[in-house]
């Protein structure tokens, strides 16, 4: 069984293996396919039209399946690798070990945002940005520039306390747990972290930055925490809702799974705590 660990507790060898698996997926072109998929759904998901990966109830099950597919790709390179998660409510500093040269590298330089250290820096030659929104072919970050503070644990707890999963109009204007976690309403959790990291993370091609996977692994963990706190609160909508994915409706692009099939993460992996 795969165990997803807090990135702050990873050993040097676990970090090395995770980075090596990322670099191998990048080298073979498999990594960029995930970036392409994510960007296509960002562009296609709209408040008043069909929406699957974002701005909708299926934000959480869609990303759970997306991360599962990516984790399986990593494990096809190295079976020992699991997706770590980044608890940004606790690990809040630009000086965190997450941003060290032996792991993800740090923030970008002021001139153009280019990440200058670590295995994903352009100077290392192993991480060209091929699926992009502009002409820049290097990984960019601007930690803490777009918004100064990451969400706090108190803000996380305020969202976890919400007892209703989602509600009409089932988009970025909805009340409920999903939309507050996604960050369109209230204290702004998920979206704020993308903006805090900056660079490609603040765009539809956000998976270009490997921290995307650690961020979304934590979002997934928060969904699991919410489920434990509210065992009688179901995924909504249950059925008959236009433009969004109901409980037993198949999700694109896979068309072989439903939100109902993804409610129990323990069939696939557990978390360290």
Curated annotation (Swiss-Prot):
Q: Which top class of enzyme applies to this chain? A: oxidoreductase
Q: List cofactor names only.
A: Cu(2+)
Q: For this protein, what reaction is catalysed? A: 2 L-dopa + O2 = 2 L-dopaquinone + 2 H2O; L-tyrosine + O2 = L-dopaquinone + H2O
Would I find Flavoprotein among this entry's keywords? no
As recorded in UniProt, its EC number(s) are 1.14.18.1
Its biological purpose is as follows:
This is a copper-containing oxidase that functions in the formation of pigments such as melanins and other polyphenolic compounds.
Q: What is this protein called?
A: Tyrosinase
Name of the coding gene: melC2
